[in-house]
């Protein structure tokens, strides 16, 4: 085990605070409508320009190990807030820095750090309750657009496109963000169930203009194994041909003789068929086939449930009003499944979401819910250059998270006003002793900091604006974009309650740990870290420079 360096009390804390300040100062310049950008160097390609707090925080790594520990702890504040609420990372960092700054002053003055922490925790609990009282539900499209606009750095087009997407696919619908190919943002809504598998042969195409296979009022055959022998398929094909309807086959794979026969039948016009591979892999594939079966009112032909392909009848097939299969995607529109069964399946998947541990699993399950329940909206971000594209895409994703948080827990006045109004709950709050009272005062001072920082980034005097806001009531606050005072809700400056709440709770949690630190242990820098110089090739006589 290598030797360690140990630092104690003020020496340890002062180094940690230096690290906290380096990270927080880099992050807080981005706060508010007049916040500035931060440019991040990349090991290859163009640098990234961002106004997203967590993106800046993630890039910061300090040389001094003790300073770096402080920076990493505050980085945890913004990461946690981003994971829980999807936005509010800069606010959380500003709050954390303020609590650490005020807390360290008190610790240096001889206060008990544990009592200070207890006082801060008490204040945060009271402030969170007050925020919940201030919160108003966010249900209409206008409020959703306003939340998205604020989160996307006052870009109204982003706020509006997110509101449109939510209106079309519902609050539960899946909204994905992709890089577009034009200069403008575009919204593409896919109704019905779409999955990322295209036709297995271009000979299935019947719409040459769109290069797609379009099947109206058709049957759907679902099979969980490979189909290579056409004899297994013949009973189904004959039944479909007699019914005079098209057929979509979804199987693990269709190859060889079976695929060739389907192509020949399609070309000759005997039966209109399209074949695609089943979506997903492994257990997820089985689950998605079952989703499609419930959506179309059919049955997955599987030996696990005692069904075989050669004995399948038309009763086992699903049906849909319309199916469109392109080279890359298949879309099933208006399946013939029973609404009760679809609803039951959605509830079942929602229960699985509650139990899921990984974010990836949750996301995939959420997609399945959306595909069964409504549809999928794709926001295609447009920009002139790749650098702008990346920055804009990050803003759209932030705004999307913020609007989801707003729908979940409601909204409060933005611009730091909600935290100032929540101070009302701390006026009469008392701790168990004097040091806890100081902890409550630290939280009170820290909760003013986001408003002060927003004003400071505008080049105005923070104390003057803060006093004016404190004298006002309700939603009265300062619009940093225009320099006017007024009702923040009416001016469309809203923050999701979940974002403000998470920022305060996470900042207090990590800051409390920092101010109660008494010793720090870090690895000693290794001597002679740089690699030894390699042996030269000696004097190569006779090879003079040209």
Swiss-Prot record:
Belongs to the chaperonin (HSP60) family. It is found in: Cytoplasm. Residues 526-546 are annotated as: Disordered. The gene is groEL. Forms a cylinder of 14 subunits composed of two heptameric rings stacked back-to-back. Interacts with the co-chaperonin GroES. ATP binds at residues 30-33, 51, 87-91, 415, 479-481, 495. Together with its co-chaperonin GroES, plays an essential role in assisting protein folding. The GroEL-GroES system forms a nano-cage that allows encapsulation of the non-native substrate proteins and provides a physical environment optimized to promote and accelerate protein folding. Its EC number is 5.6.1.7. CDD domains: GroEL (cd03344). InterPro entries: Chaperonin_Cpn60_CS, Cpn60/GroEL, Cpn60/GroEL/TCP-1, GroEL-like_apical_dom_sf, GROEL-like_equatorial_sf, TCP-1-like_intermed_sf. The keyword Transmembrane does not apply. This is Chaperonin GroEL.
């Amino acid at each position: 085990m290598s030797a360690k360096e140990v630092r104690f009390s003020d020496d340890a804390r002062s180094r940690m605070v230096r690290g906290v300040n380096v990270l927080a100062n880099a992050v807080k310049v981005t706060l508010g409508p007049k916040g500035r950008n931060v440019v991040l160097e990349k090991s290859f390609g163009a640098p990234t320009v961002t106004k997203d707090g967590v993106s800046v925080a993630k890039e910061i790594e300090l040389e001094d190990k003790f300073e770096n520990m402080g920076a990493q702890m505050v980085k945890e504040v913004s990461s946690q807030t981003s994971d829980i609420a999807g936005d509010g990372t800069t606010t959380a960092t500003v709050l954390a820095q303020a609590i650490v700054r005020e807390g360290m002053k008190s610790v240096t003055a001889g206060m008990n750090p544990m009592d200070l922490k207890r006082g801060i925790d008490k204040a945060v609990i009271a402030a969170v309750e007050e925020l919940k009282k201030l919160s108003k539900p966010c249900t209409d499209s206008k409020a959703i657009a306003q939340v998205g606009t604020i989160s996307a750095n006052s870009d109204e087009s982003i706020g509006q496109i997110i509101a449109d997407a939510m209106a079309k696919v519902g609050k539960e619908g899946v909204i994905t963000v992709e890089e577009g190919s034009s200069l403008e943002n575009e919204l593409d809504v896919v109704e019905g169930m779409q999955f990322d598998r295209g036709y297995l042969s271009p000979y299935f195409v019947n719409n040459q203009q769109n290069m797609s296979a379009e099947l109206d009022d058709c049957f759907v055959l679902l099979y969980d194994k490979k189909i290579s022998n056409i004899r297994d398929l013949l009973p189904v094909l004959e039944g479909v041909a007699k019914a005079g309807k098209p057929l979509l086959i979804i199987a693990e794979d269709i190859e060889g003789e079976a695929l060739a026969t389907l192509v020949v039948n399609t070309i000759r016009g005997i039966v209109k068929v399209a074949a695609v591979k089943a979506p997903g892999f492994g257990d997820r594939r089985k689950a998605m086939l079952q989703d499609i079966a419930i959506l179309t009112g059919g049955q997955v032909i599987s030996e696990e449930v005692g069904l075989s392909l050669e004995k399948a009848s038309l009763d086992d097939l699903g049906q849909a009003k319309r199916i469109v299969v392109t080279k890359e995607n298949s879309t099933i529109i208006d399946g013939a499944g029973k609404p009760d069964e679809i609803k039951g399946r959605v509830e079942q998947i929602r229960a699985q979401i509650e139990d899921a541990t990984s974010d990836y699993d949750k996301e995939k399950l959420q997609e399945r819910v959306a595909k069964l329940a409504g549809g999928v909206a794709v926001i295609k971000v447009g920009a002139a250059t790749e650098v702008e594209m990346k920055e804009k895409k990050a803003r759209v994703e932030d705004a999307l998270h913020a609007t989801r948080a707003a729908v979940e827990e409601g909204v409060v006045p933005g611009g730091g006003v909600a935290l100032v109004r929540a101070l009302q709950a701390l006026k009469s709050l008392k701790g168990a002793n004097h040091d806890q009272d100081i902890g409550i005062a630290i939280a009170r001072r820290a909760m003013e900091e986001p408003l002060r920082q927003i004003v400071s980034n505008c080049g105005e005097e923070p104390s003057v604006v803060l006093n004016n806001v404190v004298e006002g009531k309700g939603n009265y606050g300062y619009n940093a974009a225009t320099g006017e005072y007024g009702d923040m809700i009416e001016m469309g400056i809203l923050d999701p309650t979940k974002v403000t709440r998470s920022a305060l709770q996470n900042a207090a949690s990590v800051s409390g740990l920092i101010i109660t630190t008494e010793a720090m242990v870090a690895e000693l820098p290794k001597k002679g870290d740089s690699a030894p110089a390699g042996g030269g090739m000696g004097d190569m006589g006779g090879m003079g420079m040209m």
